[in-house]
Amino acid sequence: MGALDEGHYHAEIDNEVSFELGFETQPETLVIQDAVRVLLQGLGEDINREGIKKTPFRVAKALRQGTRGYKQKVNDIVHGALFPEAGLEGGSGQAGGVGGLVIVRDLDLFSYCESCLLPFQVKCHVGYVPSGKRVVGLSKLSRVADIFAKRLQSPQRLADEVCTALQHGIKPTGVAVVLQCMHIHFPNFESAFLDSTSQGWVKITATSGSGVFEDGNADVWTDFWSLLKFRGISIDNAHRRSSGQSWCPSQSCGMPGQANSAMTNAVNSILKSLGEDPLREELVETPSRFVKWFMNFRNSNLEMKLNGFVRSRIDTRSPQGGNFNDGICSELNLSFWSQCEHHLLPFQGVVHIGYHSSDGVNPVGRPLVQSVVHFYGFKLQVQERVTRQIAETVSSFLGEDIIVVVEANHTCMISRGIEKFGSNTATFAVLGRFSTDPVARAKFLQSLPDSGSAGR
């Protein structure tokens, strides 16, 4: 795309209001909606089903808002935001006077991965050394970073583009950018049954510097890292992980391979509608990678194989007059992956299941319980529904007294207008005695592990 071409610094930023006016009928929106319908049909879904009838529009809106950086320009942000600062006189000091390093830390951003089209989270730290007796409004550093984040990206290219744009835009003595990035992992339906402990996130740190920061060993970097040390970043760790490391999990999990041509063509049309060139080297395999990921969640009529436990269920009820709470058992931290049917974005986390067993033994074993979680997770879903489905199914072999808690991080909560970073959603369903016994519910809920970052 040539994101650093001169033209990218000289144009008008889309107004948020004008973005909404007539949005539904804009050609780009219509093309994306048609493409999403093709993708849904490729999954075997009924595009007129109530839950996904409006999904094509929701996806189109999220994608266009999430890639609006292609139409935004740096000079429109920094122009008029450079302020004179009398303290920056000629003489000694990094900035030609008494002024020194300025860092804005912990900027939460998201971007779409150019390799697979899934959103990834970014914790951005931007620093610069002023020059010419000028400083820039601090909010502008965040806005410039957001321009380039709202494009299809890789961590290193994002860091380089933010750094170069700020160097050109405010002409400081130097700019430093450090990004801490998190990408959702890439389990597939088959491997998830074999390995239920796969990591939820792939993490990497990317760095970029210009001017006095161009030399990664310069003393000014030592100052920069010192000001970040309370943010959990070390110079050795960041430098090691920003070089030569595979970023997107789709590049190291047997993808792309052969994919449905109608679906890959649909993804190509989405790329064009967003303002990208599908023939750009980094994007050539992207449609196939995305379709391979997406097909993990196809609508399947596969019958659950419960190995006869439905027909020969062990009686797990407590004896008459016995203490129900004494027999509460649990299966905790079962890994969970799914795809939001409203925005076609992944959500993942953990599932906790409580049940009653008079002898304290799981009659079927953890692997079967985990398989139930995966079976209902690897579909287009909403968290409320999958929680209920898991509870109803495990009650067929764990007994009628069931409590299920699902904790999940939803990508749609960070990669759309709401952008609520760090949020986590918990849902629970209860059957049998758990639905009427608050003491039993409380006992189970109090036993849950601290999973404030479920799935991470």
From Swiss-Prot:
Zn(2+) binds at residues 340, 343, 412. Pathway: Cofactor biosynthesis; 7,8-dihydroneopterin triphosphate biosynthesis; 7,8-dihydroneopterin triphosphate from GTP: step 1/1. Keywords: GTP-binding, Hydrolase, Metal-binding, Nucleotide-binding, Tetrahydrobiopterin biosynthesis, Zinc. GO terms for cellular component: cytoplasm. One of its GO terms (molecular function) is GTP binding. Its EC number is 3.5.4.16. The keyword GTP-binding applies. Disulfide bonds: none annotated. The keyword Transport does not apply. It catalyses: GTP + H2O = 7,8-dihydroneopterin 3'-triphosphate + formate + H(+). GO terms for biological process: folic acid biosynthetic process; tetrahydrobiopterin biosynthetic process; tetrahydrofolate biosynthetic process. SUPFAM superfamilies: Tetrahydrobiopterin biosynthesis enzymes-like. Expressed in leaves and unripe fruits. Homodimer. Belongs to the GTP cyclohydrolase I family. GTP cyclohydrolase 1 is the first enzyme in the biosynthetic pathway leading to folic acid. This is GTP cyclohydrolase 1. It comes from Solanum lycopersicum. The gene is GCH1.
